[in-house]
Amino acid sequence: MRTVYCGQLNLSHVGQEVMLCGWVNRRRDLGGLIFIDMRDREGLVQVFFDPDRQDAFARAAELRNEFCLQLTGIVRARPDSQVNSEMATGAVEVLATELSIINCSEPLPLDSNQNNTEEQRLKFRYLDLRRPVMAQRLKTRARISSFVRRFMDAEGFLDIETPMLTKATPEGARDYLVPSRVHKGKFYALPQSPQLFKQLLMMSGFDRYYQIVKCFRDEDLRADRQPEFTQIDVETSFMTATQVREVMERLIRDLWREITGVDLGIFPQMTYADAMRRFGSDKPDLRNPMELVDVADLVKDVQFKVFSIPANDSQGRVAALRVPGGAQLSRKQIDEYGKYSEIYGAKGLAWMKVNQRAAGVEGVQSPVAKFLGPQVIEQILVRTGAADSDIIFFSADRKNVVTDALGALRLKLGLDLQLTVTDRWAPLWVVDFPMFEEDGEGGLAAMHHPFTAPKDVDAQMLAASPTSAVANAYDMVINGYEVGGGSVRIHRGDMQQTVFGILAINEQEQQEKFGFLLDALKYGTPPHAGLAFGLDRLVMLLTGTDNIRDVIAFPKTTAAADLMTEAPSFGNADALADLSIAVVGKGREAMENGRS
């Protein structure tokens, strides 16, 4: 039906007869001629209908936007005065000789000027995907997947599929459960990742594995998260963490060069502790020049207790954030930033404007200056590198509150004041994460997952001091987004059982949930390490959008709903009975109300 795509026509096709298939993007009548912009997945081309071609011209009079059609025509060069430089095909046009209307279209429920809410776009996603920007994003996604496969194949990795119906294991989020009809009362879980299966593949002797795979997590959603998402999943045997990072960095560097033409260069490394101390985040955006600066030692003895109390507390922190040019901020704006910091637990912000640096304390403006004294103020100005027209924000509280609040403020100010350089890429590796973190209930949780190996300690040493252990883990960060994360895995049974014990997983629960893994660790398990990239997030970055739903063909909302198909839906009564499932409580009420 088609010999070439609309968007691929150029001057090399002049004089050729072509067959095109697509949609009417726009129709217009000009001086007895009918013109349409015809669209397919590759782009637009102008088609015109001459009254001398009576059959085609008569049919063209019936055309309306979004009619689906096939036509035959002759490619012609446009006169120089009519070349459209804003269209990729703007140097040519097609004189239609035959026209077939395949299907008509009702007026679209979406605004052609793109003044549509996201809910409208998701409700009529099949129409939203006709937009060139959406088509381009999905084409880029396909290019990325294809490039990854070629790279991994060339590096000797095997593409091996792992099960979608598996066993529920604690990996940090809630599982999506699938009831078994055959095994009454039992449930499969959709995998949060192929983590354990890829480790088992290493134990099976497949030393280089990869997979582009769907994963599922029942968690609260954000703009860059979905309940079902796609990972580029990788695992290796007999490779160190450094070697894994080298291969994966090369993959991303080559991918960026392929898609954007940009060379990312060698990725710097930063420890987790440095990232949190300097940037208030374990995924720092290095395009933003601002850094957090500790000043607790300078304010331990001041009369201002808001500063001195946390400065003398081992669990406290007093830090400053210098904002270049920030002295322009009004008092109202400063107060708004103080309220913003309260979202992250801070009790507000102290501030100091630097109007004339050379004048020392006389050149600053601050409601807390009188409590600090000239010597402390000068020390703060020196340490922060303050200059004329800067403002310095201060936060004093528990370490995590100060770090979170100033880290978030740094990002917001960077964008608000245009300090973040948005037209560059800033990749890095963050390494040496804590092995464990507090779970909020007096216990410990794995910072990554419970299969991550610690660095430089054996099982006995780990059990003796778990909170000081450093994980042999690493995250790749680009422009403030964690695009991938991985670790060296535990390959000894005693270490794995020790980690389970630290996480308060008793021996019975270990056997119930991980018995197959503990058994496998008895049979000559090789050292292994891996990583997983979020494909959706990579595509989001490479296509310049900030919403992951823009790069998934049929995404869910932030409420994990599909507005087009109206999923999830209530279960059929007979199907529920076959599965031995009874809906109770609020679910029962919702089901009855939904069907009434």
Swiss-Prot record:
Spans annotated as Aspartate: 195-198
Residue sites binding ATP per the record: 217-219, 226, 482, 534-537
GO cellular component terms listed in the entry, alphabetical order: cytoplasm
Keyword line: Aminoacyl-tRNA synthetase, ATP-binding, Cytoplasm, Ligase, Nucleotide-binding, Protein biosynthesis
Subunit structure: Homodimer.
Positions contributing to L-aspartate binding: 171, 217, 448, 489
Protein's name in the database: Aspartate--tRNA ligase
Biological function: Catalyzes the attachment of L-aspartate to tRNA(Asp) in a two-step reaction: L-aspartate is first activated by ATP to form Asp-AMP and then transferred to the acceptor end of tRNA(Asp).
Subcellular location(s) of the protein: Cytoplasm
CDD domains documented for this protein: AspRS_core, EcAspRS_like_N
One example of a Gene Ontology biological process annotation: aspartyl-tRNA aminoacylation
Highest rank taxon of the organism: Bacteria
Family: Belongs to the class-II aminoacyl-tRNA synthetase family. Type 1 subfamily.
Pfam families: GAD, tRNA-synt_2, tRNA_anti-codon
Molecular function (Gene Ontology), one example: nucleic acid binding
Keyword field contains Aminoacyl-tRNA synthetase: yes
Statement: the UniProt record of this protein carries the keyword Cytoplasm: yes
EC number(s) per entry: 6.1.1.12
